[in-house]
């Protein structure tokens, strides 16, 4: 059975499941941000446990085929080295899983933080959708909204 699971989860299948798997979490964050569903499933450890497991599985699969993990550090040497790394599908999956997990974490943080200031959930849908698509810009939008609701600018919380 383990062999069947291993052979089923190819890189393309993992990519599909990771992309589809986060959609319910984002739906809950956007539509039901203050519900128990959001607290239990999205802003808890649950989605990150799943994404972390997928991350470990990708790393394990990479290790089995002899992936050069030391080469990952060359991404800091320049854009040409980063481009070379993105030619490898395993590296793209490691990067993409990381990106999906971080964006979901930021979305959960935005929801929890917006509740402190009683920001309208309809208004919060905009930065959450943008965070899902383009993480840093959604966070930037949220901070602009937060400044108006908090009526102050704080460098730390």
Task: Annotate each PLM feature.
Residues 14, 94-101, 129:
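Hydrophobic alpha-helical transmembrane segments of multi-pass membrane proteins
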Residues 17-37:
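N-terminal signal-anchor/start-transfer transmembrane helix
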Residues 2-23:
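Hydrophobic transmembrane alpha-helical segments in integral membrane proteins
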Residues 6-11, 79-94:
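Short aromatic-rich membrane-water interface segments that cap or initiate transmembrane helices
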Residues 67-85:
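Membrane-interface interhelical connector segments
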Residues 52-72:
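Transmembrane alpha-helix/helix-exit interface in multi-pass inner-membrane proteins
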Residues 125-148:
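Hydrophobic, aromatic-rich membrane-embedded alpha-helical segments
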């Amino acid at each position: 059975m383990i062999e069947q699971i291993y052979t089923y989860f190819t890189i393309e299948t993992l990519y599909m499941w990771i992309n589809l798997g986060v959609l319910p979490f984002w739906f809950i964050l956007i539509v039901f941000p203050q519900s128990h569903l959001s607290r239990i499933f999205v802003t808890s450890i649950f989605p990150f446990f799943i994404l972390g497991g997928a991350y470990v599985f990708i790393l394990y699969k990479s290790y089995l085929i002899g992936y050069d993990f030391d080469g990952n550090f060359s991404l800091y040497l320049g854009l040409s080295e980063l481009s070379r790394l993105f030619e490898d599908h395993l590296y793209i999956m490691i990067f993409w899983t990381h990106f999906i997990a971080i964006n979901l974490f930021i979305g959960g943080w935005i929801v929890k933080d917006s509740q402190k200031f009683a920001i309208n959930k309809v208004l919060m849908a905009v930065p959450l959708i943008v965070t899902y698509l383009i993480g840093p810009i959604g966070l930037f939008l949220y901070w602009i909204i937060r400044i108006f609701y908090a009526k102050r600018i704080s460098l730390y919380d």
